[in-house]
């Protein structure tokens, strides 16, 4: 599966879209915030796993457990998001 398909299957697309803001920031907005930051992939993975609030607004992002997306697939999705122009 492609990273986009993995993200959709994991439920990411419920809140996140490639370029348009939904309930959460677009993949493009996420890439813009984290691109070039040391440790960005690990930080993003932690926020996906544990959930977060206040990074892009007041609406909390719920935790995404390994049962929904494996660590290996999550890494593929994060790498793909960071390559978003």
Curated annotation (Swiss-Prot):
What modifications does the entry list under PTM / processing?
Binds 1 heme c group covalently per subunit.
> What's the family?
Belongs to the cytochrome c family.
Q: Which GO terms describe its molecular function?
A: electron transfer activity; heme binding; iron ion binding
Q: Which UniProt keywords apply?
A: Electron transport, Heme, Iron, Metal-binding, Photosynthesis, Transport
Alphabetically, which GO biological process terms does the record hold?
A: photosynthesis
* Any Pfam family the entry gives: Cytochrom_C
Its job: Cytochrome c2 is found mainly in purple, non-sulfur, photosynthetic bacteria where it functions as the electron donor to the oxidized bacteriochlorophyll in the photophosphorylation pathway. However, it may also have a role in the respiratory chain and is found in some non-photosynthetic bacteria.
- Per UniProt, where does heme c bind? 12, 15-16, 61
Organism, scientific name: Rubrivivax gelatinosus (Rhodocyclus gelatinosus)
Q: What is this protein called?
A: Cytochrome c2
Superkingdom classification of source: Bacteria
């Amino acid at each position: 599966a492609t990273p986009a398909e993995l993200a959709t299957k994991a439920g990411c697309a419920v809140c996140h879209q490639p370029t348009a803001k939904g309930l959460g920031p677009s993949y493009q907005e996420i890439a813009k915030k984290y691109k070039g930051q040391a440790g960005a992939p690990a930080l993003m993975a932690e926020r996906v796993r544990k959930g977060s609030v206040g990074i892009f607004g007041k609406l909390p992002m719920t935790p995404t457990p390994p049962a929904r997306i494996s660590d290996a697939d999550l890494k593929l999705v994060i790498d793909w998001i960071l390559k978003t122009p």
